Amino acid sequence: MYKDIATPTRTKEILEKYGFSFKKSLGQNFLIEPNILHRIVDFAQLSERTGVIEIGPGIGALTEQLARRAKKVVAFEIDQRLLPILADTLSPYTNVSIIHEDILKADVQQVIAEQFTDVDDIMVVANLPYYVTTPIIMKLLTDRLPIRGMVVMLQKEVADRMAAKPGTKDYGSLTIAVQYYTHAETVMHVPRTVFVPKPNVDSAVIRLLKREQPAVSVSNEDFFFAVVRASFGQRRKTILNNLLNQLPNGKEKKEQIENALANAGIDPKRRGETLAIAEFATLSEQLYPIFYEEA
């Protein structure tokens, strides 16, 4: 039986052996509490037929737990200094592939086609670097990858925004974007004390299970998200004011925008954070002909 990597003693041994120093610019914080890793893997509900994509494996603490449960693990690591460490710590596992590439620049669709030829389902499981959490998640969602979902650790504040409900302070355009594609649920809070080095923020684990179809049906997704972003442009302003100020030539189309709100059954004095995703969809459909009739 191999010793878990994610203990203070074992992590220190590995880092000292390789003279590794953390790069703040890469948001490197390594977990040193194996029980938390076990729970993350449990939340992912892996089987012996599951393929896993990991982002930022670090020294392999989560990777080894995934390798023990999944059919195959493919991990993207941007820091070249970690490659020899991973080759060492993960040497007992024949079902792990490390790809030295920035996930944001990678053709993940192609990687899936090449690496996961014999799996029943695919999950993304990762302790994400906090400085690029949102871009990574949005890339994985908008690329329409054939994944079942994600279980990822990230900054608690970001997890709160992704899983927020309408009318709360955390509810915003990120909430809508994530919940358009997935069912989002915060499944665990993680204190900053279980990492080295200790981050300045607390963490949370969020589970995003992909919807078979988006949460709402819209004519144009780009325009739908433009309306959502416009509605949250200035949180203290009404939805009408935000649409007038944030949409192209909005002020020139004031009467049409007011009519669109009326047709959607939305009080123009409401604020964006009070609208449910279905209301944004209805509003987007009413506004779409106004802004695309000349397009």
Curated annotation (Swiss-Prot):
It is found in: Cytoplasm. Its EC number is 2.1.1.182. S-adenosyl-L-methionine binds at residues 29, 31, 56, 77, 102, 127. Transmembrane segments: none annotated. GO terms for cellular component: cytosol. It catalyses: adenosine(1518)/adenosine(1519) in 16S rRNA + 4 S-adenosyl-L-methionine = N(6)-dimethyladenosine(1518)/N(6)-dimethyladenosine(1519) in 16S rRNA + 4 S-adenosyl-L-homocysteine + 4 H(+). Pfam families: RrnaAD. Its main location: cytoplasm. It is an enzyme of class 2 (transferase). Disulfide bonds: none annotated. GO terms for molecular function: 16S rRNA (adenine(1518)-N(6)/adenine(1519)-N(6))-dimethyltransferase activity; RNA binding. Keywords: Cytoplasm, Methyltransferase, RNA-binding, rRNA processing, S-adenosyl-L-methionine, Transferase. Belongs to the class I-like SAM-binding methyltransferase superfamily. rRNA adenine N(6)-methyltransferase family. RsmA subfamily. HAMAP family: 16SrRNA_methyltr_A. Specifically dimethylates two adjacent adenosines (A1518 and A1519) in the loop of a conserved hairpin near the 3'-end of 16S rRNA in the 30S particle. May play a critical role in biogenesis of 30S subunits. This is Ribosomal RNA small subunit methyltransferase A. It comes from Anoxybacillus flavithermus (strain DSM 21510 / WK1). The gene is rsmA.
